[in-house]
């Protein structure tokens, strides 16, 4: 069942969802912007006795981490050794990074960039607690600077952000997940030309190696019980 709720305040939205608990066997939160989605999920999980799933976060993270595990096997690398550069500090991006940490990636090896550049200690522009958890203590500020020797690029941001020159700075057998839709951070042919040994995935079904929460969503519990904020 798809239920639309006309409420933009995260606390009020969460309380409405919690009040609906007797109606559903599980809840899938949909299209709630960051950072509000983190608060809504936290409140719902603390108060409800049924599963609470946010596919923008958890669906994407599960598929990304499964794909990353396979990519690392191909590249002969390990989670605890790799440097990851990620673009996009929204719900999907943060959830992916949190799950990658649980799989063994060291936080000190994760470099998060958003529209304002690198997330670093002391930055005040467009920050929240979820981004701050990945803030780096460094003088570097740009994607172009931090991409050097990266083992993996994780893009959940926008089109044409990753350039050929950046890819050439990455490590051997770079893993490039350019997952922005409909236009990825770099097109696969451009990435391949810049690094012939690259392991490349996008969020699109018309390119090889699709990494998208659609690969998981309809196998998750109670896919009919969806709640969206509008």
Give short role names for the model-derived ranges:
Residues 37, 60-65, 91-98, 161-165, ...:
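Short glycine/serine/threonine-rich phosphate/pyrophosphate-binding segments
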Residues 180-207, 211:
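Rossmann-fold NAD(P)-binding glycine/threonine-rich loop
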Residues 1-80:
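Glycine/serine-rich phosphate-binding loop and adjoining beta1-alpha1 elements at the start
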């Amino acid at each position: 069942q798809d239920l639309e709720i006309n409420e933009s305040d995260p606390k009020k939205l969460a309380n409405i969802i919690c009040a609906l608990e007797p109606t559903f066997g599980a809840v899938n939160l949909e299209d709630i912007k960051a950072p509000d989605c983190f608060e809504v999920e936290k409140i719902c999980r603390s108060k409800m006795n049924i599963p609470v799933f946010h596919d923008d976060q958890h669906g994407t993270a599960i598929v990304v981490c499964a794909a990353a595990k396979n990519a690392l096997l191909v590249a002969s690398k390990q989670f605890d050794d790799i440097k990851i550069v990620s673009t996009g500090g929204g719900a999907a991006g943060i959830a992916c990074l949190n799950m990658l940490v649980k799989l063994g990636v060291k936080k000190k090896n994760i470099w998060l960039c958003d529209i304002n550049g690198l997330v670093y200690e002391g930055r005040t522009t467009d920050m929240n607690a979820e981004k701050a958890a990945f803030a780096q203590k460094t003088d570097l500020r740009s994607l172009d600077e931090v991409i050097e020797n990266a083992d993996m690029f994780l893009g959940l941001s926008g089109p044409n952000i990753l350039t050929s020159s950046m890819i050439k700075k990455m490590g051997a057998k770079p893993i490039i997940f350019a997952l922005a839709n409909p236009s990825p951070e770099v097109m696969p042919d451009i990435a391949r030309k810049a690094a012939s040994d690259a392991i490349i995935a996008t969020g699109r079904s018309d390119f090889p190696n699709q990494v998208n929460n659609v690969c998981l969503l309809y196998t998750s519990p109670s896919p009919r019980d969806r709640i969206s904020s509008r």
